[in-house]
UniProtKB/Swiss-Prot annotation:
<dbReference type="InterPro" id="IPR011767">
    <property type="entry name" value="GLR_AS"/>
</dbReference>
<dbReference type="InterPro" id="IPR036249">
    <property type="entry name" value="Thioredoxin-like_sf"/>
</dbReference>
<keyword id="KW-0249">Electron transport</keyword>
<protein>
    <recommendedName>
        <fullName>Probable glutaredoxin slr1562</fullName>
    </recommendedName>
</protein>
<dbReference type="InterPro" id="IPR002109">
    <property type="entry name" value="Glutaredoxin"/>
</dbReference>
<feature type="disulfide bond" description="Redox-active">
    <location>
        <begin position="31"/>
        <end position="34"/>
    </location>
</feature>
<keyword id="KW-0813">Transport</keyword>
<dbReference type="GO" id="GO:0015038">
    <property type="term" value="F:glutathione disulfide oxidoreductase activity"/>
</dbReference>
<dbReference type="InterPro" id="IPR011900">
    <property type="entry name" value="GRX_bact"/>
</dbReference>
<dbReference type="GO" id="GO:0045454">
    <property type="term" value="P:cell redox homeostasis"/>
</dbReference>
<dbReference type="GO" id="GO:0005737">
    <property type="term" value="C:cytoplasm"/>
</dbReference>
<keyword id="KW-0676">Redox-active center</keyword>
<dbReference type="Pfam" id="PF00462">
    <property type="entry name" value="Glutaredoxin"/>
</dbReference>
<comment type="function">
    <text>Has a glutathione-disulfide oxidoreductase activity in the presence of NADPH and glutathione reductase. Reduces low molecular weight disulfides and proteins.</text>
</comment>
<dbReference type="InterPro" id="IPR014025">
    <property type="entry name" value="Glutaredoxin_subgr"/>
</dbReference>
<dbReference type="GO" id="GO:0034599">
    <property type="term" value="P:cellular response to oxidative stress"/>
</dbReference>
<feature type="domain" description="Glutaredoxin">
    <location>
        <begin position="11"/>
        <end position="109"/>
    </location>
</feature>
Amino acid sequence: MANLFNWLPLLSGRQADGIKAKVEIYTWQTCPFCIRAKLLLWWKGVKFIEYKIDGDDQARQAMAARAEGRRTVPQIFVNDQGIGGCDQLYGLDSRGQLDPLLATPPNPA
């Protein structure tokens, strides 16, 4: 599905040049909130790491450990910091806080 939406940043005129953050998202394939969150990330030209955890209880437990116990999908991490799910992602965007967050490079380990 990722290839299907690769044209979105080109259509919108958005370039991924300013995106330096490491973005990770835990998803289920048929989850509408996951699809909506990925659509916003694609629209912005974000290259993200997707963990598809459909039916994988061990992966879901690992996600919950990172997400302060939250077990719902999607769970989105920017530079290893949990930002929550789809609603939180769109909230950051509507408040103008998502783009600066995406422009922040990850801290070197």
